[in-house]
């Protein structure tokens, strides 16, 4: 069964319940959340996340395998500022606790940026950080995201991800989140040779590590190393390639999460595309009028 959803908001007083209700309104059967704003460390207490009501709503609406995304401010690749590294380690630990309490089993993490020290140095620091963070008894996996290679990002190649995983002691607690936009922007040919890319991933990392898919089109040509998401079918990857990935036999049990942009000219009144994009991917039929339909909802 196709497991598809999108990024949704967990906020206000209803928190997890609000996230599940939003996902349900999109026709989704999974979703991804941040536990708070992705650009800061302000977080509600676990008892204020409205977990019981949220889980009950999920069960009633056939929603499962939800995913948490760690905030961008975590950078455990940073060797130049010890405070940034320590904050990353501490905050990632507390995010794993929240992820576990919510009932999610995957927390997606951008591996980090080496901020000029070089990829090798950054990767060693990421390994050090993950070894500090991981509790051998935790029931959550940290899903390292495939990155576009923007700036000094680590994790642009499958080899870099494999190097991180191999360096971590309790690496049974590590998985991978494959982002279609990032992988395309990093230079992999997901458009005309996705099977080749997947085989390469399997050889280098292992397909059994693949636990989350971010399904995004890209505003950029392959190899641009920019990381700018586009609506499904309206970018450089295109609908056919993305729907092939979404319905791929080897990936059928993996949650697929859309992180495509809201639509509209008015910055204050953009509309979420997810109900329309999910339906279009389920139907396997590209709709050229989609962006207009999203605006008119």
Swiss-Prot record:
Q: Which GO terms describe its biological process?
A: base-excision repair
What PROSITE patterns is this protein classified in? Answer: AP_NUCLEASE_F2_1, AP_NUCLEASE_F2_2, AP_NUCLEASE_F2_3, AP_NUCLEASE_F2_4
Write out the coiled-coil annotation as residue ranges. Answer: none
User: For Zn(2+) 3, which residues are the binding ones?
Assistant: 182, 227, 229
**Alphabetized InterPro entries for the sequence:** AP_endonuc_2 (IPR001719), AP_endonuc_F2_Zn_BS (IPR018246), Xyl_isomerase-like_sf (IPR036237), Xyl_isomerase-like_TIM-brl (IPR013022)
Q: Give the catalytic activity.
A: Endonucleolytic cleavage to 5'-phosphooligonucleotide end-products
Q: Where do the annotations place Zn(2+) 1 binding?
A: 69, 110, 145
MF-aspect GO terms = deoxyribonuclease IV (phage-T4-induced) activity; DNA binding; DNA-(apurinic or apyrimidinic site) endonuclease activity; phosphoric diester hydrolase activity; zinc ion binding
Show the HAMAP family listed in the entry. Nfo (MF_00152)
Task of the protein: Endonuclease IV plays a role in DNA repair. It cleaves phosphodiester bonds at apurinic or apyrimidinic (AP) sites, generating a 3'-hydroxyl group and a 5'-terminal sugar phosphate.
In the record, the note on similarity to other proteins reads:
Belongs to the AP endonuclease 2 family.
What is the name of this protein?
Answer: Probable endonuclease 4
UniProt source species: Bacillus licheniformis (strain ATCC 14580 / DSM 13 / JCM 2505 / CCUG 7422 / NBRC 12200 / NCIMB 9375 / NCTC 10341 / NRRL NRS-1264 / Gibson 46)
